[in-house]
């Protein structure tokens, strides 16, 4: 726990009651930066609105969040800023910083300063020494650049992160298919089956990394082999989804040669297209349309309310494939990283 004095309280002068000289003047509270005490402080933590607020209570129950990963900056009983990390069940350390908010009614210098101090304090107390902080993720509207308020909210948080050493890594499209949207009928060009085993899936994932346009994969390939990247992706993410692996599909030509694969899944929040790829030697033939339709079809049979997916804003071929399949661009995601 850390308590510091607010660097500038001019913003609160208008809120101070005027008193006679003979009256006792109560001392102004200092800015307190601390972890939340537990679920009983969720109402405090949620005073600054964000799209993930409705998931916080269940995340705490499921172990995807912990009180020691959730931080607030308060002045008296007023919440001025907050930050929280998310982690996979059973992990000792978080994997993403996905909540960072400030009171947007504060003057710009104050809200930036308070956000920076909160984040630096929380990072020092929460994250392991000597390792880069986990990636930052912010879910934002698709037209966030077009509105003065929405742009300021996003850019303020980016400034806070930049002052702690983070840099913009990638902007991603958030996509959604909704029941009732037509799914293309099978073209007959490909057949589909579940993968035989983990080694087959790992081998296909390794091959698919050749020529990838995905920013995260390309960055990982600068630090490790394609086989290691595929193995880590499989073990750290894909294998942990609670949905059955029987949903996964390998796409094949009539002679049984694999051309790609799709991993329909449920991540505990939504049905998703977790991974889709066409092998390098088969790209350029729009096999991705057949593969994406099959993945969507698998999930649609589960009577789900929606299917979510995402791809890098710069991955134009994949974005067009989702558009052809009836997925709408309903949001964006900003990822920032520390090096």
Q: Could you tell me what each predicted segment is?
A:
Residues 6-58, 186-228:
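Short amphipathic alpha-helix that is part of the acyltransferase structural core
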Residues 81, 170-171, 260, 331:
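A structural microfeature
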Residues 157, 161, 322-323, 327:
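Conserved active-site tyrosine of GNAT-family acetyltransferases
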Residues 276-278, 311:
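Hydrophobic adenine-recognition pocket in adenosine-nucleotide-binding enzymes
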Residues 46-76, 84, 219-253:
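Active-site rim helix/loop that mediates acceptor-substrate recognition in acyltransferases
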């Amino acid at each position: 726990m850390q308590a510091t004095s607010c660097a500038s309280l001019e913003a609160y002068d208008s809120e101070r009651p005027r008193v006679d000289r003979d009256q006792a003047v109560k001392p102004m509270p200092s800015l307190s930066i601390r972890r939340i005490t537990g679920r009983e402080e969720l109402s405090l933590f949620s005073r600054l609105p964000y799209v993930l607020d409705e998931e916080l209570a269940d995340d705490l129950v499921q172990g995807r969040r912990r009180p020691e990963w959730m931080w607030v900056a308060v002045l008296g009983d007023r919440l001025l800023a907050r930050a929280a990390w998310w982690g996979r069940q059973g992990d000792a350390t978080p994997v993403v910083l996905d909540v960072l908010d400030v009171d947007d009614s504060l003057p710009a210098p104050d809200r930036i300063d308070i956000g920076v101090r909160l984040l630096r304090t929380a990072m020092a107390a929460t994250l392991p020494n000597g390792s880069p902080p986990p990636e930052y993720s912010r879910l934002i509207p698709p037209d966030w650049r077009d509105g003065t308020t929405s742009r300021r909210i996003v850019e303020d948080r980016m400034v806070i992160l930049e002052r702690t050493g983070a840099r913009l890594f990638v902007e991603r499209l958030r996509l959604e298919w909704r029941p009732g949207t037509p799914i293309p009928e099978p073209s007959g060009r490909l057949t589909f089956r579940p993968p035989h085993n983990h080694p087959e899936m790992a081998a296909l994932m390794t091959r698919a990394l050749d020529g990838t346009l995905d920013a995260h994969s390309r960055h990982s390939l600068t630090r490790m082999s394609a086989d290691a990247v595929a193995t880590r992706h499989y073990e750290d993410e894909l294998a942990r989804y609670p949905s059955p692996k029987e949903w996964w599909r390998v796409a094949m030509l009539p002679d049984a040669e694999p051309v790609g694969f799709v991993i329909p899944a449920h991540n505990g929040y939504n049905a998703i297209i977790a991974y889709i790829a066409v092998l390098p030697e088969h790209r350029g033939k729009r096999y991705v349309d057949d593969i994406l339709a099959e993945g969507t079809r698998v999930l649609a049979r589960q009577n789900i309310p929606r299917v979510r997916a995402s791809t890098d804003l710069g991955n134009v071929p994949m974005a067009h494939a989702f558009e052809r399949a009836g997925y709408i661009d309903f949001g964006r995601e900003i990822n920032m990283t520390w090096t």
